């Protein structure tokens, strides 16, 4: 095998590979030998089928597998000799026929990391906020646990219901006197004041006493997830069957034991531990970002288009996921995909720059991600999402996402190395935490059970 390489651009290479007839012959014969051990042909015992019969019966498959195997061997060999790591899938052009007695020439093109001088990344100074968890935060989680385990009891009187209470209602929507499909329910428990429903709907429910009916105009916002309702105003008819309030359980050791812990004190410790671990990770990530931002200010290089596109697709997928959890969609933003991509371009470029820098550090430091590490990561993802591990692994391989995952894991290792070699100075938190982090605290009770 001979090859010649050229740089098409600072981030793209082209390699022409020429194979001698002997290599083609050896690859075909090797594939036939593998077939001989596994295929069955009528009239022959398994493993005793002549090579000529096997080649005649399975010629197309054998030649294609032999061709691909030879290309894979060559690519691995060339990458090692060139000391490069493709960033995405390879474009392979094979104009020559693959057959006995002839050589085989083909071309591969692929993107690579740009070459640039790495800035000094060892011994950098960075500040990291200390972790502080106060009693108020712990109490907020305890209050939420009590609220989630509360009993619903009827309130005295006819109401109407107010914020903090739960109204059990029947409702149905009408437009021009006709029922609106899909907007109807019976014995629906609506917790008032918790933004579970449209403001107009909650306001209507708060005007109707227990046992009575009422109706009013309800306006659906323009970005409502159900496209057929977005922007419409309908007549909502409501009947209130019951008005209830929560009766909180006692905060005692029995409650703690129902959560898998010995006592209230152990429950508080588990909540504090959960907050501490979460906040430590957040503070560490903030310090790492500060280190990375400092390094990126010192370098300039061309960005590989495929890397930018990968970051763009990730950003769009993340945004779509966030909107879906809010009951919305990308279309609800009122922007075309072209406009969304334009808005996100600076962020995608910056993420790609960070990836290039970190992968370059990983290469210099000789860092690597093993197949076992990649497999473990995919397995953990399958466990979180409930997907079949084997199917998910095959999906990653078919789509080429396995290379994206490998590069991300490698970049993470490089970031961890830079952080480990930095001079980290702990400082007091700049400001008290807002309620945003507390929104994640329902998971704290689960973490509490896991930490027993």
Curated annotation (Swiss-Prot):
Annotated function: Involved in protein export. Acts as a chaperone by maintaining the newly synthesized protein in an open conformation. Functions as a peptidyl-prolyl cis-trans isomerase.
Assigned keywords, A-Z: Cell cycle, Cell division, Chaperone, Cytoplasm, Isomerase, Rotamase
Protein name: Trigger factor
UniProt GO MF annotations: peptidyl-prolyl cis-trans isomerase activity; protein folding chaperone; ribosome binding
Biased amino acid composition, Low complexity: 432-452
Residue ranges occupied by any PPIase FKBP-type domain in the UniProt entry: 164-249
GO biological process, one term: protein unfolding
HAMAP family according to UniProt: Trigger_factor_Tig
Organism superkingdom: Bacteria
Major localisation: cytoplasm
Enzyme Commission numbers on file: 5.2.1.8
Subcellular location per the Swiss-Prot or TrEMBL entry: Cytoplasm
Family: Belongs to the FKBP-type PPIase family. Tig subfamily.
Database matches in InterPro entries: PPIase_dom_sf, PPIase_FKBP_dom, Trig_fac, Trigger_fac_C, Trigger_fac_C_sf, Trigger_fac_ribosome-bd_bac, Trigger_fac_ribosome-bd_sf, Trigger_fact/SurA_dom_sf
GO CC aspect terms: cytoplasm
Domain remarks: Consists of 3 domains; the N-terminus binds the ribosome, the middle domain has PPIase activity, while the C-terminus has intrinsic chaperone activity on its own.
